[in-house]
């Protein structure tokens, strides 16, 4: 069992990583006997895990209600958020309830925002079931829903009480979702840890076949890196912005193509190559390093070019609505070397468009 603590004073919380955690009531601490829980999951995951998690919580004396949400990024919306509020109010659940997010990034982000908002804030626990949510979205307290004009535009910083990562969930993950998660894994190596990127080059095949020790190390290292950044910059005023490598481009793809048509990790993968090409054009990143990124993403089964039907010009309106924009200027996360990156303002739109075009015609 791996255990990492995100140290944020009185809001500190553990990340527990192991197989078989759904069999142990102690995995869901700080829940105690007699407490109320609203378990939030999705239509795909409910048949797989709802009864199991409900059973282990009830075994611990916890009173469990549940709400099942439709699947897909397109449902990370205010309308679906309202169904969670309605379920909470119909019981009714008070401020002493705990929301448990059993699912991937959509369920986790939406449930976290529900917890931040309901009666001005109730406790919640993240139980991520996809690789992407295990290594990234469940850690750090970013919660949100989408708006038709932009991804994650309505949300809050709100930390969970704990994160429970059961590695067994990955056994039911479709290959495309596994690849999507690997995009975020590879991101950590590019922006923060060159040695981890080297390890990924050597061990990607083991991750693709869900080798237990390799996957446990991979998830632990990603969570360690994410925790270090969150502790240093919880509300993304500086360092934490680096975690958005590829996201400014990727969010534009998701919004333009329609949420759910490109998985988040797929869009981020293409966006990371666009960021690398931008950095190349600025003379601060080598084509050889870009090729290492492209090779690793391709081996993981991820796209390295943007959608053919989306012109370079179509990116700009979305990028100008990005949450990192300051004084009307796009801020980009750009690699300087494998394992080192920066937040860069003032890059000309022409250069950015040319970098996007590099990835459209490649």
Swiss-Prot record:
Cofactor note: Binds 1 divalent metal cation per subunit. Can use either Co(2+) or Zn(2+).
EC number of the protein: 4.2.3.4
Main location: cytoplasm
Pathway linked to the protein: Metabolic intermediate biosynthesis; chorismate biosynthesis; chorismate from D-erythrose 4-phosphate and phosphoenolpyruvate: step 2/7
Superkingdom of the source species: Bacteria
Binding positions (Zn(2+)): 184, 247, 264
Cellular component annotations (GO), alphabetically ordered: cytoplasm
Compartments in which it is found: Cytoplasm
Keyword annotations of the record: Amino-acid biosynthesis, Aromatic amino acid biosynthesis, Cobalt, Cytoplasm, Lyase, Metal-binding, NAD, Nucleotide-binding, Zinc
Pfam families in the cross-refs: DHQ_synthase, DHQS_C
Gene3D superfamilies: 3.40.50.1970, Dehydroquinate synthase-like - alpha domain
General function of this protein: Catalyzes the conversion of 3-deoxy-D-arabino-heptulosonate 7-phosphate (DAHP) to dehydroquinate (DHQ).
Protein name in UniProt: 3-dehydroquinate synthase
Organism: Shigella flexneri serotype 5b (strain 8401)
Gene field: aroB
């Amino acid at each position: 069992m791996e255990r990492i603590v995100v140290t944020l004073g009185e809001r500190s919380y553990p990340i527990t990583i192991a197989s078989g955690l759904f069999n142990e009531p102690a995995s869901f601490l700080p829940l105690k006997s007699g407490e109320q829980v609203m378990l939030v999951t999705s239509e795909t995951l409910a048949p797989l895990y709802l009864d199991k998690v409900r059973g282990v919580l009830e075994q611990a004396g916890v009173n469990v209600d549940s709400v099942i949400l439709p699947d897909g990024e397109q449902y990370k919306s205010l309308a679906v958020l309202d169904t969670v509020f309605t379920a909470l109010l119909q019981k009714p659940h008070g401020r002493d309830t705990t929301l448990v997010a059993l699912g991937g990034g959509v369920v986790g982000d939406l449930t976290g925002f529900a917890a931040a908002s309901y009666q001005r804030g109730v406790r919640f626990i993240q139980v991520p079931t996809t690789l992407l949510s295990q290594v990234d979205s469940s850690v750090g307290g970013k919660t949100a829903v989408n708006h038709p004009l932009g991804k994650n535009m309505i949300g809050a910083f709100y930390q969970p009480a704990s994160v429970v990562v059961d590695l067994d969930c990955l056994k039911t993950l479709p290959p495309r979702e596994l690849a999507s998660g690997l995009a975020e894994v590879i991101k950590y190596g590019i922006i923060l840890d060159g040695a981890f990127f080297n390890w990924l080059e050597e061990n990607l095949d083991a991750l693709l076949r869900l080798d237990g020790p390799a996957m446990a190390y991979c998830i632990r290292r990603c969570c360690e890196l994410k925790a270090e950044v969150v502790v240093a910059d919880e509300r993304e005023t500086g360092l934490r912005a680096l975690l958005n490598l590829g996201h400014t481009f990727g969010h534009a793809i998701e919004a333009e193509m329609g949420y759910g048509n490109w998985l988040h990790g797929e869009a981020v993968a293409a966006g990371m190559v666009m960021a690398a090409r931008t950095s190349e054009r600025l003379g601060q990143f080598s084509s050889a390093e870009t090729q290492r990124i492209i090779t690793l993403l391709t081996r993981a089964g991820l796209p390295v070019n943007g959608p053919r039907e989306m012109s370079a010009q179509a990116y700009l309106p979305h990028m100008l609505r990005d949450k990192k924009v300051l004084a009307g200027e796009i801020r980009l996360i750009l690699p300087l070397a494998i394992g080192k990156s920066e937040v860069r303002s003032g890059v000309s739109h022409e250069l950015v468009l040319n970098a996007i075009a590099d990835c459209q015609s490649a």
